[in-house]
Amino acid sequence: MKKIFVLLFCLAINAVAQSPASAPQSARGLPPIIDRDLFFGNPEIAAAQLSPDGKYISFLKPWKDTRNIYVKGVDEPFSAARLLTIEAKRPIAAYFWTRDGKYILYVKDNDGDENFNIYAVAPDAKPAPGAEAPPSRDLTGLKGVRVEIFDLPKNNPDVIYMGLNDRDKSWHDLFKLTISTGEKTLVRKNTDRITGWVFDLAGNLRMATRSAETGDTEFLRVDPVKFSKIYSCNVFESCGPLQFKPGNQRIYVQTNKDANLVSLALLDPQTGKTETVESDLLGKVDFGGALFSEATDELVETWYIAARAKTYYKEKAFGDDVHWIERKFQYPKNEVMVVSRTRDERLWLVNIVSDTEPGQTFLFNRKTHTLTPQFKIREKLQREYLAEMKPITYKSSEDLEIPAYLVLPKGVSPKNLPTLMLPHGGPWGRDDWGYNTLAQFFANRGYAVLMPNFRGSTGYGKKFLDAGNQEWGGKMQNDITWGVKYLVSEGITDPKRVGILGGSYGGYATLAGVTFTPDLYSAAVDIVGPSNLMTLLDAIPPYWESIRKLLYARMGDPNTPEGKAWLLERSPLTHAERIRTPLLVAQGANDPRVNRREAEQIVIALRDRGFPVEYLLAPDEGHGFARPVNNLALFMASEKFLGEHLGGRYQEGGSPEAAKRLAEITVDPKTVVLAKKIDPNSVGLPKPAVDLVPGTYKYKATIAAGGQQIPLTISTTIQEENGAWSAVDKTEGPMGEGFDSAVIEKGTLVTRKREVKQGPVSIKLEFADTKATGTFSMNGQDKPISVDLGGPLFASAAGAVQSIGCLPLAEGYTTNFRNFDPQSQKEKLMALKVLDIESIIVPAGTFDSYKVELTSGDGSSDKQTIWIAKESHKPLKVDAVLASMGGATLTMELVQ
C-alpha cells in the first residue's frame, strides 16, 4: 500500500459524446478512442477529506468550470453538499482542515506565480443574502509573498506556524498566525539561512534546518538565545526531520549520511546521536515514508517503493484493517490508500487504485468493519479500455540497469508500434506504478509508452542519484536513448516512429533528445522545459536560494569557467542548428522556475533558420498547466501533432471551449520577440521636455482576471507643495479604497518619496540617488526597507504616467529609466519606446496621441501601452499586463 502526503487531484468529468477520430484510426484490435475530456477535463468529485471530528466530508468539485471546495455531512449524499468557495480564476490546488475542524484552509497563488497566500472558511458558514458561498478570509494578505506552513499544533488548533518571505525573498521568517483573528506575530527573524522549523508534539519550537553556505543540510537545536548544530549531511546526501516520537525526547528523521540508501532513524536533539530504526530489507531502494497515528502519534507504518510499493505495519490493528480491505479488492491487483482519518481514527477514507483504476473512494468504519461507497474518480472513464503498466529494467551505457515502466496499447500485438518516451520532471524525482494520465491517454491512441527512471532519479540510493551529477544532456540523456534502443531491439518499436514528450526537466530532456540525438525522434513536445542552462540558473526564484549550491553541484557551477562551459555545451539552445525533428513548445507566461525566455529562445532559434516550430503560450499559467481548459487545449494540439508525425490515432475536434482556448494560446513564431535585458550601466535619468501641470485626472478602469471584470475608478491629483510636486493616485473599487502618493522633484521629475496605503498594508519610502529606505507595515508590525539603487528613480510612484507625458516624445523616441518595486523590494529597469502616432477616442474626447510602450528590462511579462495626447501631454489611456497579478490586464481611460 502506497501512501501520499500531497493531495492527489484525480479528475472526474461527465461523459461527453466522442468525436470521430482522424486517420490513421483503423488499427484493428485497439479499443475505441476515449474522449480527451475524460483524461484532462474538470473533475466531478476529487480530493475528499474527513473533518477531524468525523462530522463532515469535504471535496473538490467544479463551480463555473473551476475546482472549488464543497462540504457535506458524513452521512449525507453528495447532492446535498454546500459550496464553500467561489474561486473563479484558478482551481484550488490544495486544502486542509484545522485540528479542531472549525475551519478549512486553502492556498492560492496568482496564475501560477507560486506566491501562495492562506485562506480560511468555516464549514458551517452561511452565504450572505444573494451570495452563492460564504466569504473566505485571506489570512496573509500579501502580494508577491510565498507562504510556507511549518506546523499546526494539536494543543492549540487556532494557530498556524508559518513562514513569510516578505522581508527577504530568499528566506522565510517564522510567524505565529491566529486563524480566528488573522493576527500575525513574529516568532523568529530568519537571518541564518533557515529552511524549516520543527515543533514537538506539545507545540514547542525545538529544531530548525539550515542550508549552509556549502550546500550542506544542518539540524539545529533551538536554544533560548542561540542555535546549536547537532547533525548534518553534505550536499550530496539527504536528511530531513519527520515527527517527534511520543514523549518528545527523540525525533524520527530520514537520512543517508555515510550510507547509500536513505533509512529511518531516531535522533536525540540534545546529543545529536542517531539510532537506525529500519531500512530496505532488500537493500535496493530508499526509505519511502512513514505514517503516524492521529490518535496516539505512534508510528503505524513505513513503506518503500521499488517496482511496486511495499508497506510494513508497526501497529497490528492498523495493519489488520488494511489487510481486511485489501482482501476485498484483490490486492496486489489493486492497492489500498488511506487518504484521510478522523482524530480518533474511527473513520477512514480509502482509495482503491491500480494502473487501470484512477480511484474508488470508500468510507471505512473501523468499529463496524463496513465500507460505504462514496464516489468513483473519473466515473465515466472506461476502465476496460485502459492498458496494463508493466515494470521493466534495461541496460544503459556503462551496463547500468535502468528501472522503467512500460505501457503497451491494449488489444494489439506489441510489434512495430509508434512509441512515445515520457521522461519525468525534476529531474530529482521518479515515476512509479499506478494510474498515469499521460501514459493511458497515449496508449489509448496506439502508442507504446516508456517512462524511464534514468540515473539521477531519486529513490534508488545515493550512487544512482549521484551518477546523474553534471550529466544533464549526457549520461542521463543516454539512459533515455538506450530505452529507445531496448524497445527497438525487442521488436516493440518502429524506429522511424519514435516521439518524446516531457515537462520541466522532461521538457529539457525532450529538447536535448532532438538536439544531441537528432536522428532518433520523429516528433517532440516540450512543455515548460529549459533550453539554456545558464539562463535557467540565472533566473531561479529567490526562495530557491537554499538549494542554489545543490543545483550547482548537480548541474554545474556557472561561476567557474569549467562550469559555465559545460552548462553551455549541455544547453540545447547552443546546438539548435542540429534540430531536424518537428517540435511543439508549450509554456506558461508566469512560470517562476523556467522563464518564458527559455521557450522563446528555442522558438526564435528555429524560426530564424527557417525550421518549422509550433508554440503555445498560456498567459494564465506558471510551471505547468493547472486550468483544465488549458490542458485540454495543450493535449488537443499535442495528440494531433504526434499523430501526424508518428502515425498514432488522435481525436478530431473536441469541446468548443478547448478549441477556442487553443486558438487563443497558439502563437505565430513569426511574432515572437525576445525581450532584451537592459544593461544597468546604460541607464541614466531621462530629461523631461516640460514640467508637470497642477490638476486632477479622472479615469474609468477595469481589471480583467480569470474571466472576471472588476470595475475601478482612478484619479490622479498633481499639486505644488513645499517646492516640489505632490502626486496622489486614488483607486476605488469593490475591495475598497487605495492611495499611492509621491513627492516628485520639480524640473527633473525624480521620484523622492512614496507612500502606499491599501487595507492593512502601508509602505513609506524615501529615495536618495543610490538608496531606497523606508518601512513596510501590516497589522501593526513594521519591517525596515533598505535597498541600494543604481541611480535616481523616474516615474516610480503616483503620477508616473503624467511624468512620462512630460518626456520629449516623438516617433522613434526611446529611453530607459529606473523604478523601485516595493513588492519585490528591488530596483527595476524600464524600457520606453514610442511606437506610433494615432488618433484615439476615450470618454474625454478624440485626440491625436503618441502610442508609447513600456516594458520591464528583466524579460518578464510586465508591459504597458500608454497613449499620451500630443498637444496637452495628458495620459489618455493605459493598457497594462500585470505580471504581479498573474497576467491580469488593467485598462484605464481618461474621463476628464
Regions found by a protein language model. Name each.
Residues L438-G459:
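Active-site machinery of serine-nucleophile hydrolases
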Residues N681-K771, E811-Q896:
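Acidic, serine/threonine-rich low-complexity disordered tracts
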Residues I4-A12:
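Sec-dependent N-terminal signal peptides
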Residues F59-I86:
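Beta-propeller domains
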Residues K415-G425:
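Short beta-strand element of the alpha/beta-hydrolase
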Residues N42-I45, K64-I69, E87-A93, D100-P403, ...:
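Peripheral, non-catalytic segments that deliver or gate enzyme domains
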Residues A23-I45, F78-A81, D321-P332:
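A short helix->beta-strand "capping" segment at the edge of beta-propeller domains
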Residues P452-P680:
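Active-site-proximal cap/loop segments of hydrolase catalytic domains
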